[in-house]
Amino acid sequence: MAKKPTTGKAVKKETNSKLSFHKQLVLNRFMFHFFKDGTLQGLKNRLGEDRFEGIHEDGQSLFFHELSNYLFEVDLIDLDELRRYDLNIVQHWQQITEHRNRKEDTVLNMKYFQYLSLLFTEIYLDWYFNRKQQLLDGLNNELAAYNAENDKTAKDRANQFKSYILDDLNKLAYWNATGSGKTLLLHVNILQYLHYFQNGNTHHYPDKIILLTPDERLSKQHLDELENSGFTQYQLFDKSKSAPFKGTIEVIDINKLADEMGDKTVAVEAFEGNNLVLIDEGHKGTGSAAGAWMRRRDKLTRDGFAFEYSATFGQAVAGGNNVEAVETEIQKKKAKLLFETTALGKLNEEELAQIALTSEEKRDARIQATREVYGKSILFDYSYKFFYEDGYGKESLILNLNPEEDKKDERRYEYFTACLLSFYQQQYLFNKNKEKLSEFNIEKPLWVFVGNTVSGEDSDIHAVLRFLAWFLNHETQAKAWINDLIKNKARILDTKERNIFENRFTALMNAPEDIYADILSRLFNTTHSGQRLRVLNLIGSKGELALQVGEAEPFGLINIGDAPSLYKMCEEDTTFDYQRDDFAKSLFHTLNDKDSRLHILIGSRKFTEGWSSWRVSTMGLLNMGRGEGSQIIQLFGRGVRLKGRNYSLKRSTPGERPKGLHLEKLETLNVFGVRADYMATFKQYLEDEGITPSDEILELNFETRPNMPATRLKTLKLKDGYKDNQRLGFKRVYFPELYEVPADFQGKIKQPHIKLDLYPKLESIDTSRKGDNTPVNVRNEAKLDYKIISAFDFDRLYLAIQNYKLQRGWSNLRVDKQRLIDFCTGKRLC
């Protein structure tokens, strides 16, 4: 029986008006108290190594076996419950990765932070459905401890939260960094929720399963992801069609929800009921229109349950308040209306009674208090600082050209040339070492430009086109700048008078003599200089313009909402050419193709949310990030994603990098800003998260001299063949068929004997029976008839064995369907 959770341990108090949001996650704190030394760092120390990833032969995860040693708090939950949670997680994970594993020809294993996210979810949902009052009491004990830690001064008390009520329990949020697998987490959460909701009745479903996305494009992307995870019932929401079957996942973008029915919108009342709602990029609704969105969110989930996912909750709630502050604001508005003052201290008791909040206003305050709402509902925090500290994702190099320098055309084009050379260096290294880089799963580099304005005189997209045209039209000047940059001649200095591109292009020292010509070939898809940039209006696609040099294959793509306005502006520009193509198809969906010849993608802010690609290696940001903390991190997250060696998602360490590959250049995201005020904001964000910005890191290389002893050190060595990867390892020597025992092992292996016991295990007490005269082991035993076995679905059995073989890594086992049938039907195997 589970006992009442203990309260949180006291932590160091802070006296700033607002705590770091990481320290306000009450639900997250509560979940960690299920574990001894319950912190993310403590669990990472136990589960963070690669050897704990995967499934044990008993069907449990290797994480479970490590947790069950001595780490788990047995006074809160016993081992059997942990075992049950783990089996559920393994089953759900295998279900959503089955198709992906076959597609990628690999096995996707959970990372420790993914496993903990899912384990926390299992515990929470079990308590939510089966011990709701106990869950409420435990959370309020934790919240009381949190409030006690913030009770020293008035500023501290401004960080306090009100007690949980039952209506607070039906929402969970995940603060996970971009690239940490939020989509897979979302899919498993659907299966987890349905497991507890159905409670064995597989025909029982919520009224609706709704997946909310930031825009229509991402809705379509989610459909593809659902298919890859093996879901069969899903569709884009269409209000003109009849209601789908129960259990169908309806995908709709958040912009189509409104308070009333419209031509392109649907009233949120149409979705009211016992719904399961999943909200991708949950920060979207906490901006300027937060009030309206939070009310709609409440209507959608009031009688159901919600999961939310975002990488930027911290930035999104930066301006949010707790419930008490929102209630005070409501009272001030009422006081202003009734008594023409907002000073509540000047009101007497009778006047205060007139501005007392109604139950509906109190409920609205709980809905609007975004900082408290998410502080009490974020189940797991694996935001960027933890993601980076664990070695996941790319390093970053962030530069910005200030507005004064940008006013000078020559300085701007010189800066852009350096950006282009940085991207070319990545292209050059990738193409030169493609085979060696395959081990590290490096994708073909892609240069992404993101602008704040699309049309008008100050169009950022147009500015990028003018630079590309300049580079093609001014070969001599471009060559001179490229030569200076490679030779470390100081051309662009930082505020400390340092050459910001010093030693940035060492990998190009041995590059082709005519780098400009190689840039034309690799980046612009042309072998002839002197040709002009051409903008192609792809009439057959929506919002796309292609970029090419002369008649060469397109090298770039513009993907924006208002393509006609931009194209009209291009028609008035004499520095490059333009042309209509009435029959061209969309190119955007080809960006992630292995053989894609598109090297540059230019777009607007929509790239900040959800667009997925492993290719992004260099970013150019124009007029971006002014006061938009969430967008800054979203933009950054687009580029730091990395598959890594063995799909580890991690960047390589210096000791792992082969010499001469300059792998660190390809595992670094170059971010170049122009008039982008995000620079100071983002740098401050990194420092607040405990990450040292790249411009403050000084690398010191110390030469080492080997001083090996004359006699070699004697070490113990395993016999060749003990491990699979050795020359005489079993997998390298033996290739048995299904159910075949190699001749060398005949007589050394016990014959398998399988017994399935279907008797229920019950404890009984019968007062009418005296003594212990119950017969022991009197059971009815039977064997399956071969005729029954012949009716088995052997296709399904065959595929299950193939999946198990893949999961266990038995690459040397030969699986034959007919041999499986012969074995099961009792035929002699030759």
Language-model-detected regions and their locations in the chain:
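The conserved Walker
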Residues: 178
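Conserved pre-motif I regulatory segment
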Residues: 69-175
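Motif I (Walker A/P-loop) of helicase-class P-loop NTPases
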Residues: 183-194
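Conserved tryptophan-centered aromatic signature that marks the ligand-binding surface of SH3
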Residues: 618
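Helicase-associated low-complexity regulatory tails and linkers flanking the ATPase motor
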Residues: 1-75, 101, 118-120, 125-129, ...
